[in-house]
Amino acid sequence: MITVYTKPNCVPCNFTKKFLEENAIQHSVVDVTKDSVALDMIKLHGYQGVPVVAVNGFDNSWQGFRPDRLEELKEVAE
């Protein structure tokens, strides 16, 4: 399961979501401005900004628009 933690008007967030959508990679989106528990969770894992992409939990996660990591997800999904 892929979860993208995001906020409104976030360009890197939009790029990340667009990549996932264009490549038909299933994911859920959590707006951290509306979900304080999610915001606390990403902070607990050391992240200070969004987007944060978590793949099957935070053991495999990263911050920012990372085309290299997204390409890896695309390869797995194919």
Regions found by a protein language model. Name each.
Residues 11, 36-37, 68:
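Short alpha-helical
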Residues 25-38, 49:
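Thiol-based oxidoreductase modules, predominantly thioredoxin-like and allied folds used
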Residues 7, 47, 67:
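ATP/adenylate-binding site constellation spanning eukaryotic-like Ser/Thr protein kinases
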Residues 1-25:
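Local sequence-structure signature of Cys/Sec-based thiol-disulfide redox active-site neighborhoods
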Residues 45-54:
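Structural micro-motif
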Residues 1-3, 27-28, 57-60:
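Short active-site oxyanion
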Residues 55-78:
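Non-catalytic, surface beta->alpha helical segment in thiol-disulfide oxidoreductase systems
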Residues 41-45, 72-75:
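Short amphipathic alpha-helix with an adjacent loop that forms part of the alpha/beta core around
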